[in-house]
Each structure stands twice: as structure tokens, then as C-alpha cells.
């Protein structure tokens, strides 16, 4: 739907409602509705999702659901799951949800049973990783592979590295993984440091097998390998995740060891496709299946739950509530789990590449802000970095707190009497409580604080948070978390009327970089650039590289 949502009665009703309740404090909202602490919460799969500490009333939620219906959210959701071409600018289906359908499901899109195709690739991935993990697959010298190096960028890197970090505790076959993405040579050099060529396998992840950064790194990695083991070693030390057999073969990779995916999978939605091969190599096909099943739990919830009880829809609508009615520009994602240290970076691509759009699907300009800026760090690190702004700054930053009741690792506290995990989680609960309810000047003064210091210690509260609590960080839970955010992104995109599944904004910079490369490297002084800033920068760079300016 691409009509101007801001002109609908549902939008106007929300605007009027915001004028009525926008300044109400969470302390007051809880006093008026004590049951909200348990009733404004949902359990989805293994996730307990508490959204009671948001600046919403039950009436707000009703109006947000009305807005979703006015935008056609349910119809667009059903169209996505059915395989309709909802990516209109590229005329493609959007079927990342098909990547986690069970084997006995059936979904025919454009005359093709995509479930059968998905499980054919999964079976091939499973066979390959079984051989790798058992030691049946060896390198050129007959030695067992102990390190997998994934070479990719964007969705071919951010997803796998995040999931690997989250699930490395499930590694059980003596295989570890490293990830190379940046065309800065320092990245590849650092990741190859200490590795033995004979025990290293490279996964080159590029759908077209022509991505500049990925192929540049892959070529350098091949040189590192062949310098040690000879050209014939490439076939035993490189596999590909791609759909371009010709270029894969020309690179020297046996196309029997090429794992494909489809145009209906966007890069930022692809970690549960063959792009996750590095993860499967480390944790095994059975746990990878648990990972996929976690996605499917949330997919089915999003597909079938009424909007009032639909966690991704509600969280997406609440995010839009802050973006469009409170003027919030960003959302902090704060996992109280060091294993999720890359989760915020992963969500940056998922959310910002999807919804960072300024035109609607029909090409007309949007009439409201779109796209939340996602950022964050694990707790408690962030508490000693940027929480000051969350608590006492002038900007409203809604925050998502993610935590677990059972740790992947635990150690005793300094005095030996307690659990470090309990200490971590006490900070989780304390931060959401203080962000919501704060501490008044009267309460601070009553403690004997000097009058001139009181204003500096006031904690205003009324800072909104979502709390997501699961028992433990398992493969299934990681899948559930990713799907929870995927469908929030979809919800917001539908309301804004944008195409959340293209990314034209990344293309022009790539084209211009190709044009500028010979300008930087040529033997002769280059022609003037079209703007004086770039011209001066290029000439300074050439001078410092020892080339004629």
C-alpha cells in the first residue's frame, strides 16, 4: 500500500492521542494500571517480551493496531508468506521465511516448489559439513581442516559472524571460524595470522561471485594458499556460496562444492540460507536445524497471531510510535550477553538497509520520517559508556534489553559467594527500572544531598524500554530473536508504504568507487574532479602515495 498513511483517520487519531498522553510519566501509567506489568507482556516460543515500560496505554495499542489495519499490514503479511512479488522495485518475491519451512511444507512460487529447493541445498550443506567435521574431508596434504574462513561482506558476513559468536559454545568438532569482510588488507592479514594453510578452508560467499570486496579478498587468500601448497590445492581449500557456476569454476573451485540461494532472499535476510555454511560447519547440521526451527516459531506467530497479541507487529508499531510521534531517531539494542556482542551491528543492516528509504513503493516521496537508527553494545559495557545520555540526556532513545536466566558460562563473584551472571542480570533489571521510574529531586534531597548538587543527580525516568528474557541462548533462541526483528522491520515498512527489500542507495557509491580507482592509481596527474573537495582529497592522497598530484 503506497497511499499517504499520514492522511488517514487512523494516523490523525494517533496524533490527537499523542497530544493527550505524550507527556504522561511511566510512574503515573503504572499507578493507573498496576496490572500492565504482567498484562503488557507476551510469550513467543522461548522469548518473554515485556513491553509494559513503554509510554503507551491500552488505548495507544488499540490505535496503533487500527493504523496497521489502515495500512493493510495483515494483507501485506499474507502476500509475503504466499510468495507474491512484494519487492516491487525489483519485481521479486520476498521469501526468507521459506528458508525455515519444515521439509513437509509446500510452497509453490512462480511454478517452483521452493521448499524442495531449500531442503535440497540444506541436505547438501549437511553432507558437506558432516564430512568436514568428521575429518573425511581433508586438505591437499591430507590433514584435517581446523579453521573455516568466511569471506563475504554485508549480509554474507554480518549474519554469520553474529550467529557464530552467539553459538560458539556449541562448537563440538574442533573447528573454529574466522570472518573477513573489509577490503582493507589489514582485515585479511589479521584473520590469516597464525593459520596453517594445510588446515584452513575458505568459504567465498557472493551470490554473483563478482562483489568487489569479496573477490579481492578471495583472490588474496588464494594467493596465500597457493604460495604454500600450489595451485592444485584450491579445490580442496575453497568452496563457494554463489549462483554463478561459470565464475566459481574460473576461480578454481569445484562447482560440486558450490551452494546456491535465490533472488527471493535478500542478503540481510540470508543467514539461514547457504550463507550460514560457516555456522553449520562449526555447530553441526542438527543444531543448525534447531536454529531454523527457532525462526519458524516466530514466523508462525507473526503469520497467525491477532495483531493485539502479535509481538513483532506490536514492537514494530511501538517503534514507529516513537519515531513518528515523539521524534525519536534511534533505538538502542542492549544484550546482557557478551555472546550477542555483534547483534546490534547485525540489526543495523537488517533495519537501516531495509527501511532507510525516502520514497514510497510507488516512487512518491514519503511524508514522514522513516527508518530507525539501531545501535548498541552489550551490558554492562554500555553502562560505562553511553547510558549517561540514556538516563539524563535530552534525546529520547527507546531501548531493547535482551537477557537470559541461565548463562553459557558462569564464575563466582569476587568474594566467592555469588554468581557473576546474577550480578550481570541485576544490572539488566536495575537499568530498565531506573530508566522507567527515575528518582525525584525530593527523594535525592531527603538523603542529605547538598541543594546545589540535587539537580545534577535527578533521574527523570520516563525512558522507554522493551525487556526480552529467555531461559538460555540456544540455536533456537537466536533464530527466534532474528525473526522477531525481521518482522518488526516489515511492519514498519508497510506502515510507511516503502519497499523494505531493495537497497538502491548502496549502488551509486560502488559505481563511483570503480570510476575513482584509476584516478587514484594512474601514473599521470589526473584531470580535475567535478568538485573541489574531492579533487583536493585525491591529489593529497596521490602525493602521500608517491604519485604525481
UniProtKB/Swiss-Prot annotation:
Name by which UniProt lists this protein: Glucose-6-phosphate isomerase
SUPFAM superfamilies associated with the record: SIS domain (SSF53697)
Phylogenetic lineage: Bacteria, Bacillati, Actinomycetota, Actinomycetes, Mycobacteriales
Substrates-to-products reaction catalysed: alpha-D-glucose 6-phosphate = beta-D-fructose 6-phosphate
Active site: 353 (proton donor), 384, 510
Xref: Pfam families: PGI (PF00342)
GO-annotated cellular components: cytosol
Species, as recorded: Mycolicibacterium smegmatis (strain ATCC 700084 / mc(2)155) (Mycobacterium smegmatis)
NCBIfam families according to UniProt: PRK00179.1
Entry similarity comment: Belongs to the GPI family.
Main subcellular location of this protein, as a coarse class: cytoplasm
